[in-house]
Regions:
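Pepsin/retropepsin-fold aspartyl endopeptidases
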Residues: 1-137
Length: 137
């Protein structure tokens, strides 16, 4: 089980996790908000630029949410969170207007039992060992 302390930004604490993309010659680790209210994982397009993957190589789609409608490109990339490797389906967008990349329910939450402990200000991620796409290392 991975226990991750919340990240403090000013006076607020947020449940974040390190996500390591393994699609490049050298792995790239970024922080993302573990967001049970997000249907999909949505990351800034700059992450793809660092991985040297063209944004347009993904499937073009529009997402709608509280902040309005944004254009994004759907990609499926190998990632590692804690000691678990799995393919993450993620939408990359140049129009993402929130301060964090988002790990949403579709695909990410299928790999972990997620517990938000507000009192301790930490997130616990317990891998589902029987899941066919996740591999604990």
């Amino acid at each position: 089980m991975l226990t991750v302390p919340y990240l403090w930004k000013g006076a607020q604490a947020f449940p974040v996790a390190d996500v390591t993309f393994e699609a490049a010659r050298s792995p790239l680790t970024v922080k993302a908000l573990v967001d049970s209210g997000a249907s999909f994982s949505v990351f800034r397009a700059e992450v793809l630029e660092c991985l040297r993957i063209p944004l347009s190589h993904g499937r073009r789609l529009y997402l709608e949410g509280i902040g309005g409608r944004i254009l994004g490109y759907l990609h499926r990339l190998p990632v590692r969170v804690g000691g678990v490797r799995f393919p993450l389906t993620v939408v990359f967008s140049q129009e993402l207007a929130v301060s964090f990349n988002l790990l949403g329910r579709d695909n990410f939450f299928h790999n972990f039992l997620v517990t938000f402990d507000e009192r301790r200000r930490e997130t616990r991620l317990q891998a589902y060992r029987s899941h066919h796409t996740a591999r604990v290392i």
